[in-house]
Amino acid sequence: MNRTVIVTGGSRGIGYSVAAGFAAAGDRVLITGRHREPVEAAAAALGPSVMAAVCDASDPAEVEALQAALPATVDVLVNNAGGNTDFDRPEARDLKELAASWRVNLDANLLSAVLMTAAVDPRLASGGTVISIGSIAADKGAGAYGAAKAGLASWNAGLAAELGPRDLTANVIAPGYIERTEFFRGRLTDRRRDNLITATANGRPGTPEDIAGTVLFLASPAARHITGQVIAVNGGAWTTR
């Protein structure tokens, strides 16, 4: 389709599949990641239409530095960077550590989207879209991670109102359990996995391609009247009305 697309956290999992989908559609894609080797390897594997940039989307200085590498116009921004940072930290032993663990999760999952969107905003082309990856945890609860993803949904509602007059849309996709990602950092037990699948209506885990397909739809002309929404993609594990 010859669009220009940015996908944060594009070196693996959902972000990689999203970038692959846009590349297959004929779009130019810039993927970002915190570490040079994996993001550059991902771009090389995805093909010549995909470029890589090293950036921690939660770090204002790194996002500021990234702006020099951004294309002049952007049609699609996918805020995918994030994840439950509690898996990377020991349990808090006091209030200082508790505050730090919450701030890290909020930075990774909410502030990263806010910063990237602010950086890209002047480049967003009319008819474009901002799509952020939320989580079922925003509704079912998961401590700091769930709170951060709930905040993402609330922020998106205001963002949609701001961008609407410029013919831009903004939506959140809230995945449930998605296999073939590193979300659980190897800590997912067989019993927990079975319970997550049993909770679905269709009896299967989600895949990165399920989320990528939803992203591509929201970025398509068919979705131009969808904005300010949270789209649940969880196999019926959590239903909305």
What are these regions (language model features)?
Residues 11-13:
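Conserved glycine-rich cofactor-binding loop
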Residues 54-65, 210:
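The beta1-alpha1 cofactor-binding region of Rossmann-like NAD(H)/NADP(H)-dependent oxidoreductases
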Residues 83-103, 144, 184-188:
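Conserved mid-core segment of classical short-chain dehydrogenase/reductases
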Residues 91, 165, 178-200, 240-241:
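A glycine/serine/threonine-rich, flexible loop-to-helix segment
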Residues 95-101, 129-165, 177-178:
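Catalytic loop of short-chain dehydrogenase/reductase
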Residues 164, 169, 226-228:
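Short, small/polar-rich loop/turn modules that mediate ligand/substrate recognition or access, typified
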Residues 216, 227-241:
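Short C-terminal tail/terminal secondary-structure segment
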